[in-house]
Amino acid sequence: MKSELNDDNLSIVKDYFNIVLVGNPSVGKTSILEKYVNNAFQANLENKKLIEIYKKQICLYTNSYKLKFWDITKFIGNNDISEIDMFYNCDGIIFVSSYDDKSSLENLNIWYQLLIEYVDLSTKEMVWLINKKDLNEGKVITEEQIEKKSKDLQLDYYEVSAKSGENIEEGIKKVVKKLILRCNDIEENDDNSFESSTADSANSIDIEEGKSCSIF
């Protein structure tokens, strides 16, 4: 039987995690990571790489963990996804949609089905972020649609803003916390001992479509 989390029974089984972000282009995946890692925001970021890599070190449950984020900046077709190692080797998956892009909600199913074809999702921890929560007008996705999609795909979700940073840390924390608990075979509880990060960095790599990339 699994036990509850406390500092006495938590061991560092694994001190780094690979997390992949997927979703439509221009929904704010890179902006979310820029805000989370560098506390920076720039509207209309243009990505010329297939993949952007961000790294961040965090302290959770008094231990230090290294996070490596793989930002898929372009839509990957069915022939490409099977050849990219990150989907096999990742620990967590963050789906991203945007309030001003209705197709980003619809295409969530496409990403999900592509991943199911090549990856055992029962071995991954996942969360869904809906960006641009800060918009006062121009939203084309309703809360009812979000609730239904969350239920259909069984995804926890967070409404976030890459501009203000609202709920970004909470959403990413959800994935990381689940990963730590999974590694330690511990039940999730309401513990909130999540401290700020120390070392941050962001890097990008240029990967040709269809080529594989190594993890750590």
What are these regions (language model features)?
Residues M1-E187, F216:
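TRAFAC-class small GTPase G-domain
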Residues K178-F216:
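C-terminal-of-GTPase-core extension/linker across diverse P-loop GTPases
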